[in-house]
C-alpha cells in the first residue's frame, strides 16, 4: 500500500517537476551572461563490441527487459522467444502468426505486440476440423515474416512510454530490417539475400532485399529507400519423434501454405535536425481454408534541433487485416472477417540539469482506434435463417483508446529514479441485439453499447550503480487494460451472451532485482553479465468466460455444478450461454527470472531461466468455441545456449539445451466446474531437448548455417501448443506427442 501511494505521488510529481524543469532550463538558455553549455552525463557501454549487443543492451537496463537480435540459429520465432526469461508463445500451427506470452498472459490488451513500434490487433480465425463441432480456432497474433525481423525487445512489468498503454503486463516489439541492415557503411547500394531449407515440414523460404542511400539536401542530409520480398513454402504435415504424421493428430492438406511478404521503406533526412521514415508492410497467405491479407503503413518523424529541451517523435500508423473463408464453415456458410487500426503517438523528451542532478522528462499522447467487422452467410440463399447475431464467429465492435503519458528520469551520482504517470481513457462501442423473449437479461431490447474504462497508472523504478558487479533495482507499476471487442461482443447466444457491465483489468506489479557485470572474470578479455528479477503481480477484475443456462422463469443461472436436481429439471435445453465476466477473486502471479551471458571470445554461453506460478481462471469458450486458449506457463523452463568460435571466430559450433518442467493444457472435456483443477490437466513429462548448430562466416559477404533440431529425436508435446487441447487427443483417438521429431535445416546469406 505504501508503494502505491509513493508511486502515485511520484507520478504526479514527475509532471510537475518536469514542467518546472523546462521553465528553469528556458530561463538558463535566455541568460545571455551564461556562456557555458553543460550537457547531460554520457554513459559508455561496452555492448557495442559484443556479438550479442541486443541481449547486452537489455541486460544493462534496470528492470525486467530482454532483447534478441536476428541470430536465431535457424530456429523458429517460437524457439527464439521461448529462450528468453519470463517470455513464451502460444503455439497454433493453424494461425500463421506469432503470439507472445509474457508471464502467463497473452492477447490484445494484456501484452502489447508491436512491429516497429506499431501496436498489432490482428485476430486470427482458423477453420479447423479438429475443433469442437468444426468450430474455428481463434487467437490474437502478429502477422510478420520472420525473414524481416532484425531484433525483438521484450518489456515485462515496468512502464515504457506509449508501449505500455493498454498493456497489462508488458510488451513485445519486433523491429524489421532497415536500410542500414542492407547497405554497408560507406556504400550507396546494397543487396542482402537469405535462403533456408528444412526437412520434416519446415519447407523452404527465401528473402531478397535491395536498398540505396545517398547524400542529399545538405552535407549532413541523405535520402534512402529499400524493398524486401520474402516467400515461404511450408508443408502441410510433419512427423513427431515416433514417426507419426501430424495429419493423424492435428493437420490436414489445407495446412500447406505459401505465404509471401513485402516490405518497403523510404528514409528522408534533410539534415541532422529532421528524420522522416515512410514504411509499408504487406502479408498474403492462403491456408486452412482462408485467404489472409494484411496491409500496414507507418510514418515516423524525429525532430532533434540543437537543444536538449526538444527531442520530438511522431508515429502515425494505419493497418488492416482481412480474412475471407474459401469454404463454408459449420452452420455459417462462407464468411469474412475484417479488422483495421489507426493510431498516432506523439512525444517529446527534454533533458536538463540542476546542479549535479540530470533530468530527462518525457511527455506524450497516444490515440488508437481499432475496429472489427464480420460477414457470414455468404453464398447462401435469402431463406437462410441463421443470423450473424447468434454465432461466436469474429465478434465485431469499435474501440477508441486515448491516453497521455509522462516519465521523469532523475540521475544523481550512482542513483537513478524513473517516475511515470499515464492516463487511459477507453471506449468500446457496438451493437447488442435484443435478447430472446424467453430469457431475462438487461437490457432486454436492442441497444448500442458504449463501455468506458479510464484511470491513472503510476509507476516508479529506483536503481543504483553501486559497483559494476551489483546494480540493484526495485519497481512498482499499476497498469490497466480495457475489455476488447472479442470479450464484450461474444455472441454464441446473441445479445444474451454480451455483458454490458464488463470491467477492465487492473494489475499491480512489484519487482526487485539486480544487474551484474564482471569483466576479466576468468581470463583476460572475457566478460560476464547477469540479470536476476523477482516479480509479484496481482490482477483485479480478471476477464474470463463461464457457462450459463436458462433456468426457471427465464432466469440466467451459472452452470458451475451447484444446481439441484429440481433446478436442472427446469433448465431450458435450447440455451447454453457463454458470457465473459470478471473474476471476483484477484489473480496472483509471481516468480523468478534469470538471464546470464558469458563471453570469452573462443567460448560463450547464454542462460535463461524462469520459475513462476501463473495459475489463473480459464475460459470455457476456449475449449468449446475455440477462443483464446489458456496461457498458464510451465512451472519452470530453461534454455542454455553454449558453443565455441574457431578460425579467428569465423566458425561457430554450439548447442541449445531446452529444459521444461511440469506444464499444463486446457481440458477440452470440461464439465462447467468453476474450479481450475477441473479445467487444466497436466501434460506428459517433457524431455530435455537438444539442438545443434554451426555457421561459417566465409567473409563479410557470405555466410552458411546448419542446424539439427531435436537431435535425439525425442517424442513429446510442446507446452502451450493448441494441438494438445484438441478433442481427438483428449478422446484417445490420436497420439498426444505433437512436437516435431529430428529436423535438419540449412541456410545461407549473401550481402554485398
Language-model segments: residues:
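Periplasmic-side early beta-strands and strand-to-turn transitions of outer-membrane beta-barrels
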Residues: 188, 192, 198-293, 662
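Gram-negative outer-membrane beta-barrel transporters
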Residues: 411-417, 426, 527-538, 557-669, ...
Amino acid at each position: 500500500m505504501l508503494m502505491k501511494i509513493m508511486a502515485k505521488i511520484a507520478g504526479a510529481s514527475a509532471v510537475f517537476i518536469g514542467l518546472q524543469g523546462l521553465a528553469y532550463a528556458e530561463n538558463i538558455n535566455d541568460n545571455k551572461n551564461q556562456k557555458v553549455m553543460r550537457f547531460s552525463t554520457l554513459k559508455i557501454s561496452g555492448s557495442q563490441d559484443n556479438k550479442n549487443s541486443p541481449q547486452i543492451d537489455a541486460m544493462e537496463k534496470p528492470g525486467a527487459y530482454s532483447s534478441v537480435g536476428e541470430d536465431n540459429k535457424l530456429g523458429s520465432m517460437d524457439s527464439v522467444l521461448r529462450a528468453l526469461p519470463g517470455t513464451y508463445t502460444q503455439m497454433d500451427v493453424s494461425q500463421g502468426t506469432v503470439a507472445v506470452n509474457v508471464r502467463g498472459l497473452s492477447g490484445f490488451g494484456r501484452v502489447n505486440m508491436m512491429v516497429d513500434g506499431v501496436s498489432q490487433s490482428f485476430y486470427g480465425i482458423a477453420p479447423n476440423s479438429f475443433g469442437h463441432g468444426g468450430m474455428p480456432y481463434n487467437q490474437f497474433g502478429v502477422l510478420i515474416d520472420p525473414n524481416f525481423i532484425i531484433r525483438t525487445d521484450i518489456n515485462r512489468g515496468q512502464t515504457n512510454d506509449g508501449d505500455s498503454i493498454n498493456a497489462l503486463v508488458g510488451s513485445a516489439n519486433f523491429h524489421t530490417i532497415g536500410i542500414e541492415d542492407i547497405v554497408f557503411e560507406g556504400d550507396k547500394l546494397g543487396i542482402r539475400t537469405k535462403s533456408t531449407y528444412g526437412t520434416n515440414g519446415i519447407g523452404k523460404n527465401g528473402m531478397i532485399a535491395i536498398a540505396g542511400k545517398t547524400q542529399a539536401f545538405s552535407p549532413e542530409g541523405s535520402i534512402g529507400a529499400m524493398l524486401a520480398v520474402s516467400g515461404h513454402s511450408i508443408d502441410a504435415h510433419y512427423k513427431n519423434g515416433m514417426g507419426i504424421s501430424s495429419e493423424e493428430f492435428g493437420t490436414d492438406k489445407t495446412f500447406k501454405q505459401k505465404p509471401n511478404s513485402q516490405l518497403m521503406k523510404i528514409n528522408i533526412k534533410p539534415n541532422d535536425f529532421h528524420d522522416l521514415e515512410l514504411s509499408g508492410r504487406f502479408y498474403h497467405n492462403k491456408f486452412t481454408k482462408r485467404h489472409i491479407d494484411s496491409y500496414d503503413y507507418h510514418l515516423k518523424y524525429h525532430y532533434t534541433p540543437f537543444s536538449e529541451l526538444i527531442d520530438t517523435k511522431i508515429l502515425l500508423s494505419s493497418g488492416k487485416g482481412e480474412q475471407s473463408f474459401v469454404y463454408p464453415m459449420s452452420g455459417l456458410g462462407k464468411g469474412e472477417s475484417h479488422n483495421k487500426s489507426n493510431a498516432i503517438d506523439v512525444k517529446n523528451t527534454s533533458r536538463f540539469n540542476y546542479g549535479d542532478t540530470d533530468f530527462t522528462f518525457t511527455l506524450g499522447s497516444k490515440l488508437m482506434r481499432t475496429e472489427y467487422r464480420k460477414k457470414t452467410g455468404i453464398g447462401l440463399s435469402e431463406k437462410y435463417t441463421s443470423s450473424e447475431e447468434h454465432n461466436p464467429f469474429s465478434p465485431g465492435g469499435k474501440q477508441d483508446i486515448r491516453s497521455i503519458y509522462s516519465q521523469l528520469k532523475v540521475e544523481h551520482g550512482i542513483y537513478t529514479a524513473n517516475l511515470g504517470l499515464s492516463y487511459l481513457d477507453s471506449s468500446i462501442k457496438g451493437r447488442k441485439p435484443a435478447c430472446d423473449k424467453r430469457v431475462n437479461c438487461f437490457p432486454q431490447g436492442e441497444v448500442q453499447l458504449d463501455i468506458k474504462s479510464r484511470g491513472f497508472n503510476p509507476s516508479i523504478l529506483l536503481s543504483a550503480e553501486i559497483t559494476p558487479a551489483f546494480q540493484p533495482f526495485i519497481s512498482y507499476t499499476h497498469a490497466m487494460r480495457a475489455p476488447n471487442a472479442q470479450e464484450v461482443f461474444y455472441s454464441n447466444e446473441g445479445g444474451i451472451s454480451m455483458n454490458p457491465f464488463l470491467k477492465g483489468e487492473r494489475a499491480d506489479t512489484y519487482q526487485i532485482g539486480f544487474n551484474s557485470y564482471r569483466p576479466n572474470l576468468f581470463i583476460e578479455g572475457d566478460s560476464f553479465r547477469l540479470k536476476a528479477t523477482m516479480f509479484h503481480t496481482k490482477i483485479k477484475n480478471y476477464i474470463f468466460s463461464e457457462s450459463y443456462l436458462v433456468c426457471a422463469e427465464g432466469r440466467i443461472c451459472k452452470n458451475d455444478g451447484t444446481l439441484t436436481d429440481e433446478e436442472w429439471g427446469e433448465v431450458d435445453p435450447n440455451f447454453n450461454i457463454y458470457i465473459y465476466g470478471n473474476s471476483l477473486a484477484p489473480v496472483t502471479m509471481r516468480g523468478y527470472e534469470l538471464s546470464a551471458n558469458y563471453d570469452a571470445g573462443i567460448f560463450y554461453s547464454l542462460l535463461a531461466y524462469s520459475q513462476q506460478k501463473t495459475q489463473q481462471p480459464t475460459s470455457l469458450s476456449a475449449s468449446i468455441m475455440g477462443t483464446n486458449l489458456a496461457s498458464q506457463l510451465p512451472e519452470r523452463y530453461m534454455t542454455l545456449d553454449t558453443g565455441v568460435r574457431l578460425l579467428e571466430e569465423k566458425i561457430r559450433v554450439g548447442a541449445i539445451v531446452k529444459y521444461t518442467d511440469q506444464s499444463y493444457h486446457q481440458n477440452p472435456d470440461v464439465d462447467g466446474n468453476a474450479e481450475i483443477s477441473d479445467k487444466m490437466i497436466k501434460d506428459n513429462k517433457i524431455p530435455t531437448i537438444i539442438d545443434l548448430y554451426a555457421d561459417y562466416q566465409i567473409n563479410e559477404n557470405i555466410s552458411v548455417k546448419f542446424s539439427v533440431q531435436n537431435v535425439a529425436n525425442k517424442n513429446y508435446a510442446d507446452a502451450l501448443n493448441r494441438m494438445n487441447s484438441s478433442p481427438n487427443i483428449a478422446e484417445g483417438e490420436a497420439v498426444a506427442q505433437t512436437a516435431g521429431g529430428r529436423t535438419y535445416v540449412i541456410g545461407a546469406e549473401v550481402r554485398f
